[in-house]
């Protein structure tokens, strides 16, 4: 194995023995350390432990596979260098043992253990693991059966439970509560015991005992937090009052307020409940502010406007402090505790019944799984525990495993739950001197509490174990901190440190961010003066959605909040509702969220386009070993959740021309293709379902339109569509109602139902069919198919039925022809796969499958669209922060930082906590009234604190994904006001970290980010210098704040340096001419669009027709008609005869490519002297034949077209590592150069940039000739080379009246910063062998193209182009065209 230079802490983690907890920060190389530790013990001469005697537990199967691969690679490298026969034999043996080594997830380990000892727990050895969908359905069925039994028994306790937790309509809320409670209990080591102890939380006889309990301590903490927030606000009010011109007469009252709240905080800390109540009554009694006008300045120096502002802001801060105490009153003091005690005991009885029913359900569910011979995922862990422990002591199996495993290594230890922790303890040795548990993780990245992960397990060891000090030795239990980051640039690391030193505290984030936790730069990024590498500040983009008009992209007006970076305090802005949690079904809130997301998406898209199209900076490509420009695939957009905004972002990115892919867990069932197939399945199962039936009739499966559907419905206004379909199929045909007809029974059933009105119905049917025969055709085609499918559904499997429907209807092929066809087909295949998996369970049948899907959706669950994007595709990816964990990306955008944290889970009447148990309200069953309980408040408060700590860690995970650049985006209502608030919060904090109470009061990520950035010494918000900014850790970190008051591209943005540039560069003169023509053009005098123009004839013909129409209208108007009627008729006539005034814009292309322009110019050159008749038949069209991708059966052939070979050569040249080879190329022998180039081609194939066929089409000699040629010398010697430079220009073509967007990609731009000039280089693979004058041919073919390239470089890069160079690979020769020469070719087509 290679011997990297390990840091002292890493070496200690590799060498030391005992029970070790390695706190490995983001990017610290934890996986490499774990692999090296394992490898060292396998290969050490003294130890030489076989690899299968280690248990390596990973979080995912992918991580296990990667670990196994890394160990295998290390063994292979060791084998290559081994000299001794014994060593070779040992390594070969380890290579063979590797495939049976226990490198696995904990679930897989438990599975193997159960399969080995199944007989001890009386489990069938052929058991299978039910997937989550099957388990959900089985749980639901079991619980419904259990409820039926309880209802039959009519027990009062159960009835009280139903009355307390059900509704007046059903008992679904109670069922949901029991399922949640059962799931939560199964994450405990002893679920039964945990459930039995739940009523104890409600058994209290003394207030003092309650207040000293864990629940009481949480209540105290909640009061302290709110009081602390109130004190911060009062401090702000006080500071405003004492400013020059401020309301100094407020100061005595504010001092008294602070004193009373301070006393309340003290009592909440250590007083009795009576003390707290008394202190609260005093604190909440805010006296009125004095009305005096005492001032601290002479009248001559007072600015009345400023004085009024200070008075209002001071009063507002005090009013907000009052609200904090109002929140305490509405929660802790809403019902006096003395009144709660007797109710709490009654609630304890209710909780006891709930626990008993849940335990009963657990037993019945276990029986149901045994009957089906399946287990769920929680069973795997609990069965393993059953095998490993008895009466809480290790079994023989556990002792055997402890003796067998040399060491147990656990990755991602911060994400395990108590059950998993117990399993690991039982299979590892714990006694001093023999401990062999090695744990790796980072509690700052523990973000899976919703999966029952308990970061407290990590934190307890982290706090109790001694920490390794450099030079120190081993200890029985030891923490080793790895904080050197080998992933990110120093600018990224310093920014992360600067932020989290201030906002991650033990009270708010459950761990303090200190010197041990802070990241230290370890990655090496070469800074080449000739390259624009990615070092730069972390950008923070903020906007007020209420201040931007989305339709215009401009700020709404002077009445809106001022958001300028230079003067955020000046504008008051409109009063907008804020800090309101969106409620379910709140359409206005949802629309507002969508509009905010759309604004943010446009801002993000503009920033990405600027970065990519303008080649703003280069990133380091590890595989290439060189720097290259940013590509879309290098960019990821992280969000807390994609559910509600992914589609909005995708839509805006597509408009901006940015390829994008969002992998979500929603939206699948809402797609048209899936909805149509599910509707078809529903009517196959039950044709009486009208809504699905109508959906199928309107779909391409039948093809009826709305009118036809209406005519069908008119047959039986009170019936259903199935009956109308049968009647239409029958249509009075006597043969079809005879007994021998294949659909006799179906037709006779419907005819018999409507026997009395049958004659009238027959008349109706015949009338419809006479007037609309196409209805009969469609019904005759569909009805027999429907009957055949219904018959098939009863005798074939669900999966077979579904695939038969795809083939029989051709629907799978049909959706492939629609836009996004590949995605639609993938979605339908996912549905088929879901049907296959469903039938692998004990459930069968179409009805049950549809019922399963309905329940799945009714629980708010969904599936994401099928993934059709590969890892190597050049697209911007949207992923959630949770999905990004463990990954890294060159450029990271973090969006949605202004979105409020989701607190919906805290609104449930049943709250669950592993230590505090169940929190329910005080329920008056008789009167059906609920009151908040102190236990519920305590559980809710603790859950909120833990949720906030997790949100803080989620932010840390998001920020640490970035390797080279970070861009943060968020919205803030009343942005100017918020910035002032952030400043006040920052001023009131004398310490490095903000107070816990303030941090726990956050509603959005910006509530943490804003105050921290305000303190930065660079004065990011232009508010004036901050007193203690330079004393903050990592205060030298680089940040840039951009405050947007308009959407990028529509107007300027205000920021510390410069505004964003335009991406598309329009021809200003052309736009001006267009505006002038619009002002002077008269509607009605333009030619109608869509007609072939015959010179001298069209206009007169149209005028004649218009005149005749007008005369006909006048002739039909009675002479007695009044003037208003005639005017109305003239207005109707005018509107109906209106013609679009700019027909030329309809018939021309709005966007074209350089290649298309080149093709058209060549056609005009070839046809300049052709006859009109010949030219009219072959002239180029804006709607030329599309160029489709080659079919797979052609692509897979070895032969490539010349164009495909040219593309392959261009790709190989584009990715040549010029900077890496520049200094050594001339010194290398020819065979070494050829070997390097061959490896370069092979690398492109491995990275899927080239296919194997394309790689074979690239000649090593071609690449070597280029690098050794005059053109190659230009590339080596250029100060900066930019390859594959995309551009978009707005140009006025001589052949068109309207401007057109022209897009293209330049092969290479060679920049000389010293001379301030550029050269354009284009690589051509045309076969020019035998051409007498290749220079003339290339000039004629590509003069226009190079002229456009030169124009693009000069406009985009603001650098004059000296000359254009064509390198012909077939001739190994360059041809130089001066700027003046290509200009002539350009001006023949473009108005410059």
Swiss-Prot record:
Residues 291-319, 556-594, 1051-1126 are annotated as: Disordered. It comes from the Bacteria. GO terms for cellular component: cytosol; DNA helicase complex. ATP binds at residues 24-31. PROSITE patterns: UVRD_HELICASE_ATP_BIND (PS51198), UVRD_HELICASE_CTER (PS51217). Its EC number is 3.1.-.-, 5.6.2.4. GO terms for biological process: double-strand break repair via homologous recombination. Heterodimer of AddA and AddB/RexB. Belongs to the helicase family. AddA subfamily. This is ATP-dependent helicase/nuclease subunit A.
